[in-house]
């Protein structure tokens, strides 16, 4: 099993991957509908009235009264250009946004999910992010010395060093005792082997 720091790094990498996947899903499968602010929340910047061409008047909010200067009759135009200008104005005014505005969209993009499916997957992605974040918080909470000061950690390190030296000394004593017992066992086996084979040789000699 990996140590806590390795697990923490793995969880952070997984969290970054989940963030990337979540943003990718939200960017790909939303329905591209415009955001509609609640009616009780005012806009940060009020809409401005349409500014006439070549006007020097400052912009005003859409609901403000129109200044007297802008109400004056526009300058006379050349009759030769009047019809063309009128035709242009009518043509521009007749253009309205509709389904044809999205005709240039990329046909390779997947179709957006239904609102119900999109909301369900949003909740699922959010739940996965919360679970991963809770795992990270738990791993951080069980790190050794997370609630200790620097002096306390140094003191604990010195205590562990002393315990490690003591355990090393005990290990060396056990190793020496093991070697002594091994030599004793070898001597016993040698004596037994010598006794058995020595008696057999005597029996064969006097048989």
UniProtKB/Swiss-Prot annotation:
Cellular component, GO annotation: mediator complex
Q: Enumerate the UniProt keywords alphabetically.
A: Activator, Coiled coil, Nucleus, Transcription, Transcription regulation
Point to the regions of Low complexity compositional bias: 91-108
- On the tree of life, the source organism's domain of life is Eukaryota
Q: Which InterPro entries match?
A: Med7/Med21-like (IPR037212), Mediator_Med21 (IPR021384)
Provide one Gene Ontology biological process annotation: regulation of transcription by RNA polymerase II
- The UniProt annotation puts the region (Disordered) at 36-120
SUPFAM superfamilies given in the database record: Mediator hinge subcomplex-like
One GO molecular-function annotation for this sequence? Answer: transcription coregulator activity
Query: What is the predominant subcellular site recorded for this chain?
Result: nucleus
Q: Name one Pfam family in it.
A: Med21
Q: Which residues form a coiled coil?
A: 146-194
Family, per entry: Belongs to the Mediator complex subunit 21 family.
Question: Its quaternary structure?
Answer: Component of the Mediator complex.
Q: What does this protein do?
A: Component of the Mediator complex, a coactivator involved in the regulated transcription of nearly all RNA polymerase II-dependent genes. Mediator functions as a bridge to convey information from gene-specific regulatory proteins to the basal RNA polymerase II transcription machinery. Mediator is recruited to promoters by direct interactions with regulatory proteins and serves as a scaffold for the assembly of a functional preinitiation complex with RNA polymerase II and the general transcription factors.
State the name under which the record lists this protein: Mediator of RNA polymerase II transcription subunit 21
